[in-house]
From Swiss-Prot:
UniProt xrefs under Pfam families: Zn_clus
Naturally occurring in which organism (per UniProt): Emericella nidulans (strain FGSC A4 / ATCC 38163 / CBS 112.46 / NRRL 194 / M139) (Aspergillus nidulans)
Induction comment: By ethanol, threonine and acetaldehyde. Expression is autoregulated and subject to carbon catabolite repression.
Protein's recorded name: Regulatory protein alcR
Function: Positive regulatory protein for the ethanol regulon, alcA and aldA. It control positively its own expression and possibly in a negative fashion the expression of the gene coding for ADH-II.
Gene Ontology CC: nucleus
CDD domains noted in UniProt: GAL4
Chief location bin: nucleus
Biological process per Gene Ontology, one example term: chromatin remodeling
DNA-binding residue intervals: 12-49
Keywords assigned by UniProt, alphabetized: Activator, DNA-binding, Metal-binding, Nucleus, Transcription, Transcription regulation, Zinc
Length: 821
């Protein structure tokens, strides 16, 4: 009887990938004795035939001691080997740093890790995704270099040693892809499991669970290669463990960067649209502690699951899978930015093959996420919105021709950066959802009866339509749930904050205008009961504005709320003096959280000035806008600048999370001040104002450039004194983020802009000081400029833009020094 199995199952990997007929011999034992084990295609194209590897494994098996062939013996052998391998994985040892148990990246990784990220979607469960996997395209870009990622797997991991040659990407997909598709529940479970103990990336229990999973050994029942089933099962276990560990590492990086920053930037206390702006909920206080969660990502997924009526329809099964895939790939692309090299320092010297392999991984992850987001542009989903926001913060890999074509000047690099497009897409969708949510709230409020004396009560007896009392309207889950309402408010405020910063940096128009970003109320304007409408002359009623209507988001709202801190016991705000270090941890966290919207307000004022300048506003309007902007700047200088200076002076004494928060916040603030100086210079140059601001421009630029250089110096101080010393941030953060505090920054381009702008300003000052006799001042300026360049070199490990700008600045600084000497 003829063999009914598919001929493709008899083919080697290269022939199956190339869809060629494989003429490998059927009697492989005889062929091995005759020395013919490769098919003609592999011989012709000089490929490594799979049957070469199989023959070598069979030869090793013949030389080993004979084993029993009974089913019981095979089962015992199969189950004992994974347990032995699991025992070789080191158990995390407790130390004074409580560091995550991640191995050093310089340990040699097994050969089977090659190409593991050739298709980034394999890190998650996308076996039946609506978006094509493009596995064959991914196979063409596979690199032969060793995989440089820190997988938390020791180099002598015995499960992978049996493979002398790596499998092709197609074979990797067959091993790595599980039999089910992603959904919101899987994502939430994955996020919650990852954040149960942020200090752990992997543990031996997870390995034992993988080893005991009976599904891993299903290959033993396959009719193909029964004598090598043990090897294939062990390889499957190793790959599955590597995939799980890779996922945990990437999720850990996302957690330690994005969610860490959002726990400070985005709270119910500093969100103007939140119902709980007067106090900080206990859950948010816990988010400031050492064990924070993936709060926003989890809440966005939960909101998306119950927002059917808000979007107007339910998502189809394919749309749900596409949304989950887009969010997963956005997180993968975001986390893939951070280098995994063991070498430390700004002058990183990485072998060319490893550097090329890592760049290929980053490029593939970025392209996969971009394609997934392009396929989901028409899907009304909060997961897609959040994925666009995350991806807009992700730096792409620049090709060599792109680097030479755009040059290294910061303005050219920003002009060609396409990241704002994804952020604008997210903000337009958020704005649409907010409009729908406001309508739903008004419909819910409409069921309440108006007070006596109103139009409704006057005509109640004439136009009233009876309704069954038993059919009481049901509130929508989003409207009824305080958590979902708060999540929607936080999402909208997150989009507004990023839109404001992006518009100021890239000099692009705002997606959501000042009027559309005001606080909206579902309740109609209150009308006094004693003032009914005069039906004779239709005199409009007097309206009593609510507290929210008195609050202008871009007025002095944040300046008033920042003067008080939340009192958690009475759920009120109490007046507090400006925070100074040393202080309690919670006081420091609350001060930084309250300062965040003030920073956003300055960016908004800068954007308003840019808009007025573009529209050709009158000198009086421009001057009034300038004074409003300077009022915000002076408020920060009096309220928060002393605390920031304390943090810079005591950087190494600060808790790790306070370090990460203040460095990012201070860098953002000084960039806004330098952008303000640019706008004022444009106003003076074009003679749009009757007042000359040249002295103010000079002071703003120099003061803030020096402040940025001091920020870089404080962050780099530990590396200068002891390059091998572990950073205090090593206690709570993934080791890819711990070398210097500003590596935690999720929005890399903002700090690139800040450090680069400060360095360019200091370079210009070198021309002025170099003409004088103040040698000490010249040397100090040169040193400060060098601090900014070194900070950019560190950021260049995850951003080509930073590396290019650092090289350009270094050439400029060397030229200035040569001319001075």
């Amino acid at each position: 009887m003829a063999d009914t199995r598919r001929r493709q199952n008899h083919s080697c990997d290269p022939c199956r990938k190339g869809k060629r007929r494989c003429d490998a011999p059927e009697n492989r034992n005889e062929a091995n004795e005759n020395g013919w084990v490769s098919c003609s295609n592999c011989k012709r194209w000089n490929k490594d035939c799979t049957f070469n590897w199989l023959s070598s494994q069979r030869s090793k098996a013949k030389g080993a001691a004979p084993r029993a062939r009974t089913k019981k013996a095979r089962t015992a052998t199969t189950t004992s080997e994974p347990s032995t391998s699991a025992a070789t994985i080191p158990t995390p040892e407790s130390d004074n740093h409580d560091a995550p148990p991640v191995i050093n990246s310089h340990d040699a990784l097994p050969s089977w890790t090659q190409g593991l990220l050739s298709h980034p979607g394999d890190l998650f469960d996308f076996s039946h995704s609506a978006i094509p996997a493009n596995a064959e395209d991914a196979a063409n870009v596979q690199s032969d270099a060793p995989f440089p990622w820190d997988l938390a797997i020791p180099g002598d991991f015995s499960m992978g040693q049996q493979l002398e040659k790596p499998l092709s990407p197609l074979s990797f997909q067959a091993v790595l892809l599980p039999p089910h598709s992603p959904n919101t529940d899987d994502l939430i479970r994955e996020l919650e499991e990852q954040t149960t103990d942020p200090d752990s990336v992997t543990d031996t229990n997870s390995v034992q669970q993988v080893a005991q999973d009976g599904s891993l050994w299903s290959d033993r029942q396959s009719p193909l290669l029964p004598e090598n089933s043990l090897c294939m099962a062990s390889d499957s276990t190793a790959r599955r463990y590597a995939r799980s560990t890779m996922t945990k590492n990437l999720m850990r990086i996302y957690h330690d960067s994005m969610e860490n920053a959002l726990s400070c930037w985005l709270t119910e206390h500093n969100c103007p649209y939140s119902d709980q702006i007067s106090y900080l909920p206990p859950k948010q206080r816990a988010e400031w502690g050492p064990n924070w969660s993936n709060r926003m990502c989890i809440r966005v997924c939960r909101l998306d699951r119950v927002s059917t009526s808000l979007r107007g329809r339910a998502l189809s099964a394919e749309e749900d899978k596409a949304a989950a895939r887009a969010l997963h790939l956005a997180i993968v692309a975001f986390a893939s930015q951070w280098t995994q090299h063991a070498q430390r320092g700004a002058g990183l010297n990485v072998p060319a093959d490893i550097a090329a392999d890592e760049r290929s991984i980053r490029r593939n992850a970025w392209n996969e996420a971009r394609h997934a987001l392009q396929h989901t542009t028409g899907i009304p989903s909060f997961r897609v919105i959040f994925a666009n926001i995350i991806f807009s913060l992700t730096q792409s890999v620049l090709d060599d021709d792109e680097q030479h074509g755009m040059g290294a000047r910061l303005d050219k690099l920003l002009e060609n950066d396409g990241a704002p497009v994804f952020l604008e897409t997210a903000n337009r969708q958020l704005y649409t959802f907010r409009h729908k949510f406001a309508r739903m709230q008004r419909r819910g409020k409409a069921f309440n009866r108006l007070p006596g004396g109103s139009v409704a009560s006057t005509f109640a007896g004439i136009f009233e339509t009876p309704t069954p009392s038993s059919e009481s309207p049901q509130l929508d889950p989003v409207v009824a749930s305080e958590e979902h309402r708060s999540t929607l408010s936080l999402m909208f405020w997150l989009g507004i904050m990023f839109d404001t910063l992006s518009a100021a940096m890239y000099q692009r128009p705002l997606v959501v205008s000042d009027e559309d970003s005001q606080i909206s109320s579902a309740s109609p304007p209150r009308r006094g009961a004693e003032t009914p409408i005069n039906l004779d002359c239709w005199e409009p009623p007097r309206q009593v504005p609510s507290n929210q209507e008195k609050s202008d988001v871009w007025g002095d709202l944040f300046l008033r709320t920042s003067d008080s801190l939340p009192d958690h016991e009475s759920h009120t705000q109490i007046s507090q003096p400006a925070a100074r270090w040393p202080c309690t941890y919670e006081q420091a966290a609350a001060a930084l959280s309250s300062a965040t919207p003030v920073k956003v307000l300055l960016y908004r004022r800068v954007t308003q000035l840019q808009t007025l300048l573009y529209r050709g506003a009158s000198p009086a309007r421009l001057e009034a806008a300038i004074q409003r902007t300077l009022y915000v700047y002076n408020h920060w200088t009096a309220k928060y600048q002393p605390f920031m200076q304390d943090c810079v002076a005591n950087h190494e004494l600060l808790p790790s999370r306070i370090q990460s928060w203040y460095v990012i916040l201070d860098g953002h603030w000084h960039l806004a001040a330098m952008l303000l100086a640019d706008v004022l210079e444009s106003i003076d140059r074009d003679s749009y104002s009757d007042i000359n601001h040249i002295d103010l421009v000079t002071k703003l630029r120099l003061d803030n450039a020096l402040a940025v250089s001091a920020l870089a110096r404080s962050s780099l101080r530990g590396q200068e004194l002891d390059p091998g010393k572990a950073s205090p941030m090593y206690r709570h953060f993934h080791d890819s983020l711990t070398e210097v505090a500003f590596l935690v920054e999720p929005w890399t381009v903002v700090l690139i802009h800040s450090f680069a702008k400060a360095a360019y300003i200091l370079l210009d000052c070198l021309d002025l000081d170099g003409q004088g006799n103040a040698l000490a001042g010249y040397l100090q300026l040169r040193q400060n400029c060098n601090y900014c360049i070194r900070a950019l070199q560190f950021l260049g490990r995850k951003s080509d833009m930073a590396a290019l700008v650092a090289k350009d600045l270094e050439r400029g600084l060397n030229g200035k020094v040569d001319s001075f000497l």
